[in-house]
């Protein structure tokens, strides 16, 4: 198993330099070494590719840079592989043929920063068709409130399959809760191909944060990335900044973060189970799951002042404490929730038509799950034993004992069972942390954030790993990159839907628990009706 020495040696072998800061290894190599180092890390070291971030560093050192972010979950390490690129014409070699999951973030870096990637087709991904060519909004010379002239729209035609029927799904559809567009190609009752077009509500939060917000204000922006797992995003951002600045967060604040994170996981999974039962026509299960979920929402409001757990995190700690009275009530309500949930979910998953519709449908083989870099319950249902709470521990998770449920079937039932078992584990984690909750302050004594530092953090959200990359600047992030787990999971739908009955498409789509507000920029392209190409970008 590789460790820090092996990664530092890898940097030297590729004409680069390596350095270590805490749990992060930074490897800086010339662009021509990127493919070699990415291949060894992905294929030999089995490092997990998380995302990449383009950065306009011209005001700092007259260069652009591209940073590929990996994690070595067995060693508990973050590995950032960085290359500096020329300021006039930034070009880097593509690694997407070696690491398929890199396809998406390369396209995003091209679209938003104008970084070209040799050896691949570059397509407009995030920006609308009317956006003028050559204008890249994440460059530092583009002002956040600038309105570029409207160019003539050049809509891209995504080659239809003439031999198959077309079934549009969205952008507004009862099976979708946000505006997205799926185009299913069918022969008879079977799905043979899928096209996906999103990007309808891109909000440009990275540019907003880098342009006009201070570090603490970004917390409140981060938690609004997602309507379900906002606390995961604000925690991930805060941890990344704290790591970059070397801020020691009080232990009590770390415990409170983990408690709220697990409460959010419970209500998210209960919401998903209810939606899944509704899509299967089992509305009794839907009603009961949402009835039980209401207990979690009441606890969230009691602990945080909001059913949506907003306004808790700050860089350096948390804003609300947990009293002894609240501890007692949480423990009592969770015991009742667990008992109620156990009765309902056992009945629901043994209901014949629910069991039949979930078992054997939407299968994602393990090799495809690894190749595409899927996250969370989608990965664990396909036999990939990965969970950042255990592998890359943060907040107070090192003080809790829990199991990571893993199934090998890779079908819709396995993804449901992962979430069911995680509800039980989350209840156990909250009980353990409340029992051990230490005394002490809620905020670090000093919160000083020097410029020029880098922090990378993964937080295991209900849907999988949230990744936040922060390069510190003067009073605000110089670069903030966000990658939501749905970003990694949507491309797997092409595999999961292939050869499935059209009637099973909605529940298979829902089985990844997609959050389009987190991800909302995906295209699935079939070139010339033959060659397949995934393209997706998510920088929020």
Residue ranges and their predicted role:
Residues 1-194, 268, 353-361, 368, ...:
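Terminal low-complexity/charged segments
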């Amino acid at each position: 198993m590789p460790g820090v020495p092996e990664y530092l040696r890898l940097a030297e072998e590729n004409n680069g330099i390596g350095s270590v800061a805490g749990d992060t290894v930074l490897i800086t190599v010339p662009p021509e070494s990127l493919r070699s180092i990415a291949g060894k890390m992905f294929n030999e070291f089995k490092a997990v590719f998380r995302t990449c971030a383009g950065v306009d560093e011209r005001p700092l050192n007259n260069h652009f840079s591209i940073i590929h972010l990996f994690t070595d979950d067995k060693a508990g390490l973050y590995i950032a592989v960085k290359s500096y690129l020329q300021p006039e014409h930034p070009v880097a070699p593509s690694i997407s043929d070696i690491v398929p999951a890199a396809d998406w973030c390369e396209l995003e870096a091209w679209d938003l920063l104008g970084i070209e990637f040799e050896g691949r087709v570059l397509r407009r991904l995030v920006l609308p068709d009317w956006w003028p060519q050559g204008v890249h909004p994440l460059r530092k010379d583009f002002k956040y409130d600038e309105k570029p002239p409207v160019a003539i729209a050049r809509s891209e035609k995504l080659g239809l399959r003439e031999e198959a029927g077309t079934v549009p799904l969205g952008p507004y559809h009862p099976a979708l809760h946000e505006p997205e567009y799926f185009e299913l190609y069918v022969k008879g009752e079977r799905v043979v191909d899928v096209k996906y077009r999103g990007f309808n509500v891109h909000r440009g939060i990275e540019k907003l944060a880098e342009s006009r917000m201070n570090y603490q204000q970004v917390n409140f922006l981060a938690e609004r990335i997602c309507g379900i797992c906002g606390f995961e995003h604000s925690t991930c951002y805060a941890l990344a900044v704290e790591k970059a600045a070397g801020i020691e967060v009080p232990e009590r604040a770390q415990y409170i973060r983990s408690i709220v994170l697990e409460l959010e996981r419970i209500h998210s999974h209960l919401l998903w189970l209810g939606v899944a039962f509704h899509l299967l026509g089992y509305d009794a299960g839907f009603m009961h799951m949402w009835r039980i979920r209401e207990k979690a929402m009441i606890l969230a409001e009691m602990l945080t002042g909001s059913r949506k757990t907003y306004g808790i995190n700050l860089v350096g700690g948390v804003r609300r404490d947990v009293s002894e009275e609240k501890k007692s009530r949480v423990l009592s309500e969770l015991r009742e929730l667990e008992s109620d949930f156990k009765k309902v979910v056992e009945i629901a998953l043994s209901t014949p038509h629910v069991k039949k519709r979930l078992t054997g449908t939407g299968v994602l083989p393990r090799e495809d799950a690894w190749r595409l870099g899927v996250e969370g319950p989608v990965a664990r249902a396909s036999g990939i034993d990965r969970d950042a709470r255990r592998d890359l521990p943060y907040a107070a998770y090192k003080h809790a004992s829990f199991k990571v449920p893993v199934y090998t079937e890779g079908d819709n039932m396995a993804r449901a069972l992962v979430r069911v078992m995680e509800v039980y584990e989350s209840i156990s984690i909250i009980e353990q942390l409340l029992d051990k909750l230490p005394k002490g302050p809620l905020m670090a004594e000093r919160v000083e954030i020097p410029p020029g530092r880098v922090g990378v953090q993964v937080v295991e959200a209900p849907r999988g790993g949230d990744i936040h990359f922060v390069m510190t600047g003067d009073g605000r992030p110089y670069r903030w990159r966000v990658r939501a787990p749905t970003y990694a999971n949507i491309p797997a739908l092409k595999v999961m839907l292939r050869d499935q009955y059209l009637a099973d498409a909605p529940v298979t789509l829902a089985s990844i628990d997609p959050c389009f507000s987190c991800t909302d920029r995906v295209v699935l392209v079939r070139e010339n009706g033959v060659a397949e190409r995934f393209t997706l970008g998510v920088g929020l």
